[in-house]
Amino acid sequence: MNAAEIKALLQAHGLTPNRALGQNFLVDEAAAAAIAEASGAAEFPVLEIGPGLGALTEELLRRSSQVVAVEIDAAMVSILKERFPSAKNLLLQHEDFLDTDLGALAPLLGTQCAVAANLPYYVTTPICMKLLTSELPIARMALMLQKEAAERFTTLPGSRQYGPLTVLAQRYYEVKTLMTLPPARYYPQPDVDSVVLTLCRRPGVPVLPALPRILAAAFSMRRKTLLNNLRSTGLSKESAEALLEQCAISPAARAEALPPEAFARLAAQWEKISI
């Protein structure tokens, strides 16, 4: 969909973009096609988050055997039903993705699936954390994010953006920048550039159930040492010291200085400890 089509569609339904929901609709048809292709839609069933007016949905439906689209805005759901009335490979879910039971969607998404999303800035972190800690068999993701949010995925240890999201993304996925989209590629135009990231699951990397808990503790007080912060997991000071020593990590280290593999060692070792 181009800008003229999107404006006409909104006008026909007496709608304006909902700023409270961070609605900025993609108006670049070539970009929508490239994002759909990069998401892995041709290979896997797709979970789409925030389909909006369906610019990306249209491209996903052309490629994927199954698209499960979760949309919070009832007006958008109605328009999507009008636009794709005979799409047998589309399942629309009218709800807040943060409230969605991903376990209930799993049977629809098969043994491997893809994710495609145009994420508003204000919910980027909770949505991405939900994806990165879910049990869905996600093989690939294509995410449209504001530039500042995208930097959290690609940043290095030592930066202020480095945090739990960074570690989880880089531990389990190969993260690449697909393209940068200037404000003119959206309606209405946002204030900053957007970035499309692709995340490809790293083969053979085991899931560490304790990793989210370790990260939450480690980054809970960024100015405190790991020794101090890890005690919030229930470890005594002596046990926390022993854990860090076993993982060859200084007790004086701070979370923002550790690479993802160090947190993986911590989580794997922590799981062996009886608290």
Language model features with spans:
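Short helix/strand-capping connector loops at secondary-structure junctions
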Residues: 242-251
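Active-site-proximal catalytic alpha-helix in oxidoreductases
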Residues: 220-223
